[in-house]
């Protein structure tokens, strides 16, 4: 059965699109048919991350306007034949797209692909809300800092209010030494505090930026980052892969971010 995952974050700069591209490639490397949709209208980026910027003729808004058919807008990856990209429009904004438009497009993609990944714009604006009705599940991306975690908690609330299952969480740019010293929140504590399933932890590494400069995704190659991303992909396709934990319980540090009352934990 086909699945559509929306990949979202509270704030920008947490590596959401980088991870979305990597997960799409990781699934394709395992022979899965994958479509990835760039839903960040006006600020597309996945075409560059996937090395496909010179292959775009049509985009998502062209499909909605009827300028082209969906199959004409899909860009097939030259290295991974089971991976296709539906690029965002570069010269439009989110007002050109409705939630019904996204539902129709995702529904059609699910007929031909086993996995549909939708890279949402950061935040909780219209672009994010347009995708809510089209997704089966949500993957939230955060970094282990106060601002990112507070924002992702807000996104999680909107997702569950809409009726979708509790999101899965990826903690990106974790630094083991800082977690062990108590200077950074432990990923498992973040997941427990937000009451989310921890899908995976990706360490911070200069490798990622270097690969982006070479138009390679973060999952390509060998190293700690690639190993972490491959474990996440294997979990997504149903394998039971344990998550290596960084042993430092920094739960006490959350007292400055949360307050507890009779209703439970709330953000300050």
Where are these regions (language model features)?
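Conserved beta-strand scaffold positions in the cores of enzyme catalytic domains, especially
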Residues: 4, 85, 198-201
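Walker A/P-loop NTP-binding active-site region of P-loop NTPases
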Residues: 4-69, 115
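Flexible glycine-/small-residue-rich
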Residues: 9, 38, 87-90, 120, ...
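Short, conserved glycine- and acidic-residue-centered signature motifs
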Residues: 16, 20, 98, 102, ...
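P-loop/Walker-type NTP enzyme "switch/lid" segment
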Residues: 39-111, 210-214, 218-219
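Conserved catalytic-core segment of NTP-binding enzymes
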Residues: 100, 104, 108-111, 115-210
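C-terminal lobe/tail of nucleotide-utilizing enzymes
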Residues: 161-268
